[in-house]
Regions:
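Class I S-adenosyl-L-methionine-dependent methyltransferase catalytic core
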Residues: 1-192
Length: 192
């Protein structure tokens, strides 16, 4: 399956979605909504982006296309990691992209020396480690003062997610729910 970059300097370029039942690429409609919402909040020029559960890298590539200076992709599955590496090479983005082959929770838990202006997470819908990721992002101060952290989830996990994040989604698009976190609206995930 091929995905297209929606806007910016890479508009229309195609990337390959991994051949895996472990990923569910963010649809064009959801990506467009996310970035239209962010466009009103963030100046993308020169920002640093973190893309958890990176998969094809579509969210990170949209960020680069709109002006982000660099993206750190977090992906633990080796075949998906390899696909992501191929996408980076096909777009000639080796200098502005880094892939960390790691579990998202482990990266968030043990990274203490980096700050990101934008953090994006599109975990598998029925994986609940995202609550720990959010907790460690704020516990380790990974989000910059004026930064945004957007998490994509399914309407099917709404009740558990509202409990886990301590907040309602800020946007619903079909069966997708988006949660927004900032330093001023920091979530209080379960276990705190």
């Amino acid at each position: 399956m091929k995905l297209r970059i929606i806007s910016g300097s890479l508009k229309g370029r195609m990337i390959k979605a991994p051949d895996s039942n472990l990923t569910r690429p963010t649809t064009d409609r959801v990506r467009e909504t996310i970035f239209n919402l962010l466009h009103n909040k963030i100046d993308f020029d020169g920002i640093s982006v973190l893309d958890f559960f990176a998969g094809s890298g579509a969210l990170g590539f949209e960020s680069i296309s709109r002006g982000a200076s660099n993206v750190t992709f977090i992906e633990k599955n080796y075949p998906i990691y390899k696909n992501l590496l191929e996408n980076i090479k096909s777009l000639n983005l080796e200098e502005s992209c880094e892939i960390v082959k790691s579990d998202a929770v482990q990266f968030a838990k043990y990274t203490t020396d980096k700050r990101f202006n934008l953090i994006l997470a599109d975990p598998p819908f029925f994986q609940y480690s995202i609550y720990e990721v959010v907790k460690y992002v704020f516990g380790n101060n990974l989000l910059s003062e004026e930064g945004y952290f957007i998490v994509e989830r399914s309407i099917q996990t709404l009740k558990k997610d509202v409990e886990g994040f301590g907040k309602e989604p800020f946007k619903r698009i079909g069966d997708t729910c988006l949660y927004e976190f900032t330093k001023s609206t920091e979530a209080k995930p379960e276990g705190d």
